[in-house]
Amino acid sequence: TGRGSAYNEYEYIGFGITLDQGRDMLAEAEELLIKAWTGKNIDHHGHYWQSKFPELRPRPYQKPHPPLVRACISEASVAEMAKVGRPVLIGVQTVDTLRHRLDLYRDIMHDAKFSDSQVEYSLDQTWVQRGLVVAESDQEAQDIAGPALDRYRKHLLDARLNYNTSEVPVVDPSRPRPPGEVLEQAFLAGTPRRVAEQVDELRDIGARNVMLNANVGQIELQHVERTLRLFGEQVIPKFKDA
């Protein structure tokens, strides 16, 4: 089960709360979720929720409860999850940052006295994120991914300008872009051979799973379909025995 706090203020406005309140609510939401999955005669008195019910039906099939996975952008969130041995979904970061965070995650789990097998299990369930464009040439892939990322970034900026309240500071356009808005960091893009090299690079730093988005910024359907076909036929087979 995935849980994540959103990262845009406007995503909270419809619920009548702020982004900071949403972050504070996350821990209690997970606590209540586990109580509901595992307990009976639930009587929860928290800061945000007051809940009382006999039990959840039907009961979860997985025991003691479905595994929880949290989407994490910040290093602090990754460290927090490592302390409790929970897998994470890491948003787009540079290769060097990913290497550091995966090493940090492993070290913190060991410091928290998790066994080697528990650390390996959590790393096996941890994912990193990238966009994906596979084409006949590296240049064509860049020509598709670049404008797509620009459209995606414009959508985010427009939504923040249109829907954030006046109390929310406007992002300084001169500030360096975060990794998720930088083409070379946000995408695996190129020929099947080049994309396989990029996957290899992620594997070499300790990433074991990659969440891929083949339609960042409303890429045209024929390009999305070609990406999926080329990736499935010419990239995935290179890693089947890995």
Please state what every model-predicted region is:
Residues 5-9, 94, 132-134, 216-218:
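Active-site-proximal loop/turn and secondary-structure-junction residues that shape catalytic pockets
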Residues 73-96, 101-102:
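A conserved active-site cap/scaffold subdomain adjacent to cofactor or substrate pockets
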Residues 6-17, 83-84:
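Acidic/polar active-site rim loop that often engages polyanionic ligands
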Residues 1-3, 68-71, 88-91, 124-131, ...:
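Hydrophobic faces of well-ordered beta-strands that scaffold small-molecule active sites
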Residues 137, 219-230, 240:
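Short glycine/threonine-rich loop-to-helix capping motif typified by GTGT followed
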Residues 20-56, 96-208, 240-242:
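An alpha-helical appendage that flanks or caps ligand/catalytic pockets
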Residues 92-95, 213-225:
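Glycine-rich, proline-tolerant flexible connector loops at the mouths of alpha/beta enzymes
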